[in-house]
Amino acid sequence: MSYVPIVIEQTSRGERAYDIYSRLLKERIIFVCSTVEDHMANLIVAQLLFLEAENPKKDVYMYINSPGGVVTAGLAIYDTMQYIKPKVATLCIGQACSMGSLLLCGGTQGMRYSLPHSRIMIHQPSGGYKGQATDIEIHAQETLKIKRLLNELYSKHTGQELKHIEKSMERDNFMSPEEAKKFGIIDNIISSRDVMTMSAK
C-alpha cells in the first residue's frame, strides 16, 4: 500500500490531521493521480458532487497525472464534470493519456491547462475478449460504438472535424503541451499558479 502524507494544521480546537488529498479538497482541488478505474472514479465523482453541494458557484480545480484506464470509469468522471454547476478547471501535471486526456479537454472552455513539460496522448479504445464467437462479435461492436462516442467528444471539445479526430486517434498520438494547445485539447500552457488564476478570470 502506497504511503499518503499526513498534514497537521493548528486550529482553535487544537491540532487537526488530514491526509494530503483531503487537505487539497479543502482548497477545491481534486487530484486524478492514477489509473482510471471504477473505485477511483467513484471517489472523484463523490468529490465533484461534494464540492458542488458546498458551493455551486465556486470553481473546481482538477489536477491530472494519469496514464488513462477504463473507458466507462473515465466517462463517469467526464459526465459528472459536465453535470455539476461549478466550472471545472483542468491541469495536466506529468501526463494525461487516453482517458486522462479526455478529462483534460473536458474541462471548462478557457480553463484547460498544462504545465510546460507534461505529455498528452490520445488514441482509440482497445479491448481483448475471449469466449464464443457471437460474444466476441458483440464486444467488438460495443468497442466500435465507444470509439465513435469518444471521437465525437474529442471533436466537441477541441473544435476539430470528426474525420481529423478519427485519423489522429488511429494510433497512440503523443503531444507536447504546444501541440495539445494547437490541437484544442488545452487552452493555455502555464508555469505558475498566478498565470492560471489570471487566465481563469
Curated annotation (Swiss-Prot):
<dbReference type="InterPro" id="IPR029045">
    <property type="entry name" value="ClpP/crotonase-like_dom_sf"/>
</dbReference>
<keyword id="KW-0720">Serine protease</keyword>
<dbReference type="InterPro" id="IPR018215">
    <property type="entry name" value="ClpP_Ser_AS"/>
</dbReference>
<protein>
    <recommendedName>
        <fullName>ATP-dependent Clp protease proteolytic subunit</fullName>
        <ecNumber>3.4.21.92</ecNumber>
    </recommendedName>
</protein>
<keyword id="KW-0645">Protease</keyword>
<comment type="similarity">
    <text>Belongs to the peptidase S14 family.</text>
</comment>
<dbReference type="GO" id="GO:0006515">
    <property type="term" value="P:protein quality control for misfolded or incompletely synthesized proteins"/>
</dbReference>
<comment type="subunit">
    <text>Fourteen ClpP subunits assemble into 2 heptameric rings which stack back to back to give a disk-like structure with a central cavity, resembling the structure of eukaryotic proteasomes.</text>
</comment>
<keyword id="KW-0378">Hydrolase</keyword>
<keyword id="KW-0963">Cytoplasm</keyword>
<feature type="active site">
    <location>
        <position position="123"/>
    </location>
</feature>
<dbReference type="GO" id="GO:0004176">
    <property type="term" value="F:ATP-dependent peptidase activity"/>
</dbReference>
<dbReference type="GO" id="GO:0051117">
    <property type="term" value="F:ATPase binding"/>
</dbReference>
<dbReference type="GO" id="GO:0005737">
    <property type="term" value="C:cytoplasm"/>
</dbReference>
<feature type="active site" description="Nucleophile">
    <location>
        <position position="98"/>
    </location>
</feature>
<dbReference type="InterPro" id="IPR001907">
    <property type="entry name" value="ClpP"/>
</dbReference>
<dbReference type="InterPro" id="IPR033135">
    <property type="entry name" value="ClpP_His_AS"/>
</dbReference>
<dbReference type="InterPro" id="IPR023562">
    <property type="entry name" value="ClpP/TepA"/>
</dbReference>
<dbReference type="GO" id="GO:0004252">
    <property type="term" value="F:serine-type endopeptidase activity"/>
</dbReference>
<dbReference type="GO" id="GO:0009368">
    <property type="term" value="C:endopeptidase Clp complex"/>
</dbReference>
<comment type="function">
    <text>Cleaves peptides in various proteins in a process that requires ATP hydrolysis. Has a chymotrypsin-like activity. Plays a major role in the degradation of misfolded proteins.</text>
</comment>
<dbReference type="Pfam" id="PF00574">
    <property type="entry name" value="CLP_protease"/>
</dbReference>
